[in-house]
Amino acid sequence: GGLPLLGRLLKRLRAPVAPAPAVSVLGWGNRVAGALLWGPGGLWEVRAGAVLLATGGFGRLFPVTTNPHGATGDGMALAWRAGAGLRDLEFVQFHPTALPNGALVSEACRGEGALLLNAHGERFMPRYDPLAELAPRDVVARAVFRERERTGGVYLDLRPIPHLEERFPTVVAQARALGLDPLRAPVPVAPAAHYAMGGVRTDAFGHTGIPGLFAAGEVASTGFHGANRLASNSLLEGLVVGWRAALRALEDL
């Protein structure tokens, strides 16, 4: 995802990174011209010809989420206070299978044969959709939620996957870190807040309509994903819109 990509970029650019949260964006006339940061010693200003917000979503507003701790919606608040528009904030995608600590269990596991069971040990997805475990995320997430409410729990049985430990070592390690052994028994799962389709209103070039202010990635709402993003399309959006926004920002200086 984004963190490994950022690490690669920073190595190539050899750019300094200030570990300081932004408090607000700064204006100059009718355009954005930098940001006010909270760093060592208090507040300090960083002046810039353009500001590109790439702060992620707001999954941490939910009790169970796959998002990192920084995903608190601050970028959207910064943009809104600067006069940018927000849209589609109600469209939050819930990943259907997360472990109790929010660790994501990939759809690829169900694609390889993992089965969803309710607390009675019954496979239930065929009752909700002809595609069963391979139904779209929103369908599976709603089914998991309903079965948890109805029976008291939902479990993912990973044992049908051949060579599970070799195919999905991260999933096995995350489960074992919680004291679970997916090679011996199904593991408890639940829907978790995963991705915000809504955010700062932008065009396909990341421009917010405020001169000098751009946004890319989950913080932005380009409209590309509709109400239910397809898996992995967010990475493509971040790469394409991030690149286009950088070029447009240079033109906008």
Residues covered by each model-derived region:
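Glycine-rich loop(s) and the adjacent beta-strand/alpha-helix scaffold that form part
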Residues: 50-103, 233-243
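A glycine-rich dinucleotide-binding beta-alpha-beta segment and adjacent secondary-structure elements
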Residues: 18-31, 170-220
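Short beta-strand to alpha-helix junction loop
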Residues: 1-11, 17-18, 65-73, 98-102, ...
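Feature captures the FAD/FMN-dependent oxidoreductase FAD-binding
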Residues: 1-47
